[in-house]
């Protein structure tokens, strides 16, 4: 199979995706035009910045490791080069399943909780693959798990950005993508630093771990803010209900 066949397959997949979006995604009305300046108002709040930072740090953490998954598998885990396509396929399957699993349970948990929990599992998987990379089954399983976590948290993070954006939803979605791409680039650079210093390939997971840890910290703060506000709203509803009961009492 020539290299042109791979491009043809990718183009066919893109065409199928385009057709599926046209068929399955419902039409929605255009967003109201609130003016240019209004699109930036949501950036006055803390929460969008926390989520944007977490998107960059979390994805940067994963790609610090994943950018060097080939040398990790071949030189540390002793996975044959002929099996690398299987490893990459498993990681891709993990991404799909992580996204689907998050969607399945999204009605039972808040987006803040899902994002923080997924980020927590991501950082633990990166720490684990650093120590267990010499055992090929663990290295492959943890790589798949980490890949699943990245796309597990992507949905809740996008929802959090859109929900906090108000008049600037398109800008928020764009900034989330910018943060994602910046995290990928910076993460790949940081992951390569230990290798440049002569360390084994599994050391790429260490910068990834600390990036993911920082991202988890931001999402944890975001979750705390959400929890405090939920408690305040609950207390307000209880107080209003008490006042209503007292007003009806003889």
What are these regions (language model features)?
Residues 97-111, 195-196:
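Helix-to-loop junctions at the C-terminal end of transmembrane segments
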Residues 23-54:
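Juxtamembrane intracellular "pre-TM" segments in multi-pass secondary transporters
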Residues 1-11, 80, 193-213:
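A membrane-interface helix-boundary motif in multi-pass transporters
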Residues 6, 11-31, 218-223:
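C-terminal membrane-cytosol helix-exit motif in multi-pass small-molecule transporters
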Residues 112-157:
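C-terminal transmembrane helical hairpin of 12-TM major facilitator-type secondary transporters
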Residues 163-201, 207-208:
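A late C-terminal transmembrane helix in Major Facilitator Superfamily
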Residues 44-64, 144-148:
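Pair of pore-lining "gating" transmembrane helices in MFS-fold secondary transporters
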Residues 20-22, 209-243, 249-250:
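Multi-pass alpha-helical transporter architecture, strongest
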């Amino acid at each position: 199979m020539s290299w042109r066949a791979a491009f043809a397959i990718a183009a066919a997949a893109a065409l199928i995706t385009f057709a599926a979006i046209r068929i399955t995604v419902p039409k929605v009305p255009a967003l109201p035009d609130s003016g240019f300046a209004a699109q930036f108002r949501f950036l006055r709040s803390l929460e969008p910045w926390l989520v944007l930072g977490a998107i960059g740090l979390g994805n940067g953490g994963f790609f610090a490791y994943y950018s060097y998954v080939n040398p990790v598998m071949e030189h540390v885990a002793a996975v044959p080069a002929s099996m690398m396509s299987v490893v990459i396929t498993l990681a891709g399957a993990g991404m799909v399943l992580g996204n689907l699993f998050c969607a399945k349970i999204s009605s039972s948990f808040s987006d803040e909780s899902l994002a923080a929990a997924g980020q927590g599992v991501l950082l633990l998987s990166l720490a684990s693959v650093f120590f267990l990379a010499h055992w090929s089954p663990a290295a492959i399983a943890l790589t798949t798990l980490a890949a699943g976590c990245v796309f597990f948290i992507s949905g809740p993070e996008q929802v959090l950005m859109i929900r906090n954006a108000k008049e600037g939803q398109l800008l928020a979605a764009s900034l989330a993508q910018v943060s994602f791409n910046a995290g990928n680039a910076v993460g790949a650079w940081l992951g390569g630093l230990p290798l440049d210093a002569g360390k084994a390939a599994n050391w790429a997971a260490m910068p990834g771990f600390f990036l993911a840890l920082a991202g988890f910290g931001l999402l944890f703060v975001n979750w705390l803010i959400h929890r405090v506000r939920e408690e305040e709203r609950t207390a307000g509803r209880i107080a209003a209900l008490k006042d209503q009961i007292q007003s009806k009492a003889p």
